[in-house]
């Protein structure tokens, strides 16, 4: 049996956490031969800690063979001690009458503290996925608050947008989703992100040629993917938790175990590729192998695409400037 991998999850008793933990403990994220120790962080209030205790009791009651241990805490330094993987799910949700900039500042406090705790106690090669919104900028804040860790350790979740775009293309084509490759989602995890199927194929055939409908792309496909989260809240009365948890598992699984040459979308620190400001955490096409990701480089960007990429980059730069005074 392999040595256990330590996985931290913040916001562990929340909706996404609840949809995530049992799948991690069953081996869906890191492999069916990989034991895990779950290190679970929740808020220090009595209600959150009681809920966390209940979730841990349920995890015990599943008797997962791969669950080698659990820690439940309200202290980030305890939760992040010696971890290999961190899923930063917990974030301050937007309340009634709350401006986006207020939300940014509230979350900046959380992710500054968590970045500092990771810097202090996590393994030096820890893989960090930020799920809590605004995910790209929260990941940027955590990265900047952990100066002793490699910036490439920090990623934001664009995989939910990627998966949503895949399913919309499959519906349009009337083909199985599993045959679609080389889809890209550029930018911020927000309604400005740009799902781009110019390079995508379905069973090896060009999707752009098959659809050949720029009107559908601009007026249906892009807005449907961008507003899908809001549509789910409207339909369900709650935000998308199970699909977000599923995307987090996909993201980490591919990062750790490899994407087998397939393109996936990850929010990663820009190296200046595609004209994206260096350091901004931006959705790019990547391939993953041996625990490392590599950007897919030198894709042609047409005028239509450039307009969308510029818009989502402008939003990210505005978010970055809104929190830069907190990061020294």
Swiss-Prot record:
Membrane-spanning intervals of the chain: none
Residues of the active site: 189 (proton acceptor)
Entry GO MF terms: L-malate dehydrogenase (NAD+) activity
Residue positions binding NAD(+): 11-17, 107, 114, 131-133
Record flagged with keyword NAD: yes
Enzyme Commission code(s) on record: 1.1.1.37
Catalytic class of the enzyme: oxidoreductase
Keywords assigned: NAD, Oxidoreductase, Tricarboxylic acid cycle
Residues given in the record as substrate binding sites: 94, 100, 133, 164
Example of a GO biological process term: malate metabolic process
Highest taxon above the source species: Bacteria
Catalytic reactions on record: (S)-malate + NAD(+) = oxaloacetate + NADH + H(+)
Pfam families found in the cross-reference section: Ldh_1_C, Ldh_1_N
Key word Glycoprotein present: no
Family that this chain belongs to: Belongs to the LDH/MDH superfamily. MDH type 2 family.
Task performed by this protein: Catalyzes the reversible oxidation of malate to oxaloacetate.
Name under which the protein is recorded: Malate dehydrogenase
């Amino acid at each position: 049996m392999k040595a256990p991998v330590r996985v931290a999850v913040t916001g562990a008793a929340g909706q996404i956490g609840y949809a995530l933990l049992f799948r991690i403990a069953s081996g869906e994220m890191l492999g069916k031969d990989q034991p895990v120790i779950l290190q679970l962080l929740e808020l220090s209030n009595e209600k959150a800690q009681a809920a966390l205790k209940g979730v841990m009791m349920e995890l015990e009651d599943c008797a997962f063979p791969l669950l080698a241990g659990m820690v439940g805490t309200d202290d980030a330094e305890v939760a992040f001690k010696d971890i290999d993987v961190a899923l930063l799910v917990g974030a301050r949700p937007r309340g009634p009458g709350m401006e986006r900039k207020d939300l940014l500042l509230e979350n900046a406090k959380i992710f500054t503290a968590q970045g500092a705790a990771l810097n202090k106690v996590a393994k030096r090669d820890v893989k960090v996925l930020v799920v809590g919104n605004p995910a790209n900028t929260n990941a940027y804040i955590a990265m900047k608050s952990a100066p002793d860790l490699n910036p490439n350790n920090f990623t934001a979740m664009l995989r939910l947008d990627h998966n949503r775009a895949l399913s919309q293309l499959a519906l349009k084509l009337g083909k199985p989703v599993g045959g679609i490759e080389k889809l890209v989602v550029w930018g911020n995890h927000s309604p400005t992100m740009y799902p781009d199927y110019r390079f995508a194929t379905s069973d090896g055939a060009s999707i752009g040629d098959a659809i050949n409908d720029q009107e559908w792309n601009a007026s249906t496909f892009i807005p449907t993917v961008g507003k899908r989260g809001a549509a789910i809240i409207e339909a369900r009365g709650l935000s998308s938790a199970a699909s977000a948890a599923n995307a987090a598992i996909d993201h980490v699984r591919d990062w750790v175990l490899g994407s087998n040459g397939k393109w996936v979308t990850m929010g990663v620190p820009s190296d200046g590729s595609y004209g994206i400001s260096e350091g901004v955490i931006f959705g790019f096409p990547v391939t993953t192998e041996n625990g490392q990701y590599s950007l897919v480089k030198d894709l042609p960007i047409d005028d239509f695409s450039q307009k969308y990429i510029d818009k989502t980059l402008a939003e990210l730069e505005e978010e970055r400037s809104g929190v830069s005074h907190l990061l020294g």
